[in-house]
Curated annotation (Swiss-Prot):
Pathway: Amino-acid degradation; L-arginine degradation via AST pathway; L-glutamate and succinate from L-arginine: step 4/5. Its EC number is 1.2.1.71. It catalyses: N-succinyl-L-glutamate 5-semialdehyde + NAD(+) + H2O = N-succinyl-L-glutamate + NADH + 2 H(+). It comes from Escherichia coli O9:H4 (strain HS). HAMAP family: Aldedh_AstD. It comes from the Bacteria. Belongs to the aldehyde dehydrogenase family. AstD subfamily. NAD(+) binds at residues 220-225. This is N-succinylglutamate 5-semialdehyde dehydrogenase.
């Protein structure tokens, strides 16, 4: 029984699904997808639970959310192992994900008060008030790269605001989704407030097609995000928050410390085996001897990165990708770039057949025409050279995406110029592209999405503002508008 609907664990009526460790092949989870009727059942449960949940005070809802945070803390080791084994990421990185889940809850609570709480302004004849109200029933689609942390970036603010939820984890991380849901169950969520439906494309299509849905919160690929946008087009009554991918540029201008710049680049491009939406995909390198020295050092250090199993000791920097298929897609992308004329500096290699252990790849594309503006979701870095900083900015903006952008340079003036001209939701200076703060917005423009699914800004799309003009008594104004006559004379 792997679906959680209206407070009960039930068996899915759809296709059977098996999840294996992407490195060892060990069977981790088995279950059945939710059928279309079960998706509708989850929606009815969420709709029925909404009025009571929304009418609870914020303090009452907050108690449940904080109880969940405590359960995350007490079950940290177990959840870390589940996420690591299912995604293939090393233990250390899965542990940072669970820590981020815990820390984000307190920030989400503070954000609700600051951004979407209640305000009152006194007026000469009354008061103006601002309140926020929940949308209703929301669908949350989770990604596989951070199967606990990123869905919770939607779920926690949505619950605090008073919404009820139908959560569909990625079909590649059903075990993590179930493990997190069981902690919510222990936290004491009333039946129907949060429902879990497992499944792939068919389940997702059934969920997004529900007429009685008030909104959809999505983190994942641009292709799926575009499909959801088309599916919900013509329905402005439904909130649609999309956090999608990026073809992110990292500009290496002047470098004072080559090793520090190489470390930043590796953290930007290869952490999580390149499976972060903010990862650097395009390295824009200033032409010249210093750029040559930097690139040679980057290749040398990257060559030492050997992916390993989640529990290897000593711990590896990167683990496997989410699946062997995902790893093979990266290799295929590299082969296509090489066939276009790219010069391979470091070839990505699958270490073992039937696993997802893939070494990083670096390929120079300077002077190659027609390179696709697509996100390769894995450890593959493409390199272009530039001559002037103005050219670097033009190259950085030459994408339909707009998620993250970074600059390595000692010159503040160049960063100020980039801040003015960059088309990206995240613009960093001498910091990895993959770094993020829950108190700052997280998201992009263009094909990278619309709203900002971090703890702080997620509050904005989880509730709608209600304005009120109020007075505790009704009196006739001392001064009337022209043409109004309230005298006692009878007009004949």
């Amino acid at each position: 029984m792997t679906l959680w609907i209206n407070g009960d664990w039930i068996t899915g009526q759809g296709a059977s699904r098996v999840k294996r460790n992407p490195v060892s092949g060990e069977v981790l989870w088995q279950g059945n997808d939710a059928g279309a009727a079960q998706v509708e059942q989850a929606c009815r449960a969420a709709r029925a639970a909404f009025p009571r949940w929304a009418r609870l005070s914020l303090a009452e809802r907050q108690v449940v959310v904080e109880r969940f945070a405590g359960l995350l803390e007490s079950n940290k080791a177990e959840l870390t192992a589940i996420i690591a084994r299912e995604t293939g990421k090393p233990r250390w990185e899965a542990a940072t994900e669970v820590t981020a889940m815990i820390n984000k809850i307190a920030i989400s609570i503070k954000a609700y008060h600051v951004r979407t709480g209640e305000q009152r302004s006194e007026m000469p004849d009354g008061a103006a008030s601002l309140r926020h109200r929940p949308h209703g029933v929301l669908a949350v689609f989770g990604p596989y790269n951070f199967p606990g942390h990123l869905p919770n970036g939607h779920i926690v603010p949505a619950l605090l605001a008073g919404n009820t939820i139908i959560f569909k984890p990625s079909e590649l991380t059903p075990w993590s989704g179930e493990a997190v849901m069981r902690l919510w169950q222990q936290a004491g969520l009333p039946p129907g407030v949060l429902n879990l439906v497992q499944g792939g494309r068919e389940t997702g299509q059934a969920l997004s097609a529900l007429e009685d849905l008030d909104g959809l919160l999505f983190t994942g690929s641009a292709n799926t995000g575009y499909q959801l946008h088309r599916q919900l087009s013509g329905q402005p009554e439904k909130i649609l928050a999309l956090e999608m991918g990026g073809n992110n540029p990292l500009i290496i201008d002047e470098v004072a410390d080559i090793d520090a710049a190489v470390h930043l680049t590796i953290q930007s491009a290869f952490v999580t085996a390149g499976q972060r939406c903010t990862c650097a995909r395009r390295l824009l390198l200033k032409s010249g001897a210093q750029g040559d020295a930097f690139l040679a050092r980057l290749v040398a250090v990257s060559q030492r990165l050997t992916p390993g199993n989640w529990d290897d000791e000593p711990q590896p920097f990167i683990g496997g990708l989410i699946s062997e298929q995902a790893a093979q897609q990266v290799v295929t992308a590299w082969q296509q770039l090489e066939a276009m004329g790219g010069r391979t500096l470091l070839a990505p290699r699958l270490l073992q057949s039937e696993t997802s252990l893939l070494t990083p790849g670096i390929i120079e594309m300077t002077g190659v025409a027609g390179v696709p503006d697509e996100e390769v979701f894995g450890p593959l870095l493409r390199v272009w050279r530039y001559d002037s900083f103005e050219e670097a900015i033009l190259m950085a903006n030459n994408t339909r995406f707009g998620l993250s952008c970074g600059l390595v340079s000692p010159e503040r003036e160049k960063f100020d110029q980039l801040l003015l001209e960059a088309r990206a939701g995240i613009v960093n200076w001498n910091k990895p592209l993959t770094g993020a703060a829950s108190t700052a917005p997280f998201g992009g423009i263009g094909a990278s999405g619309n709203h900002r699914p971090s703890a702080w800004y997620a509050a904005d799309y989880c509730a709608w503002p209600m304005a009120s003009l109020e007075s505790d008594s009704l009196t006739l104004p001392a001064t009337l508008n022209p043409g109004l006559d309230f005298s006692d004379e009878v007009v004949r």
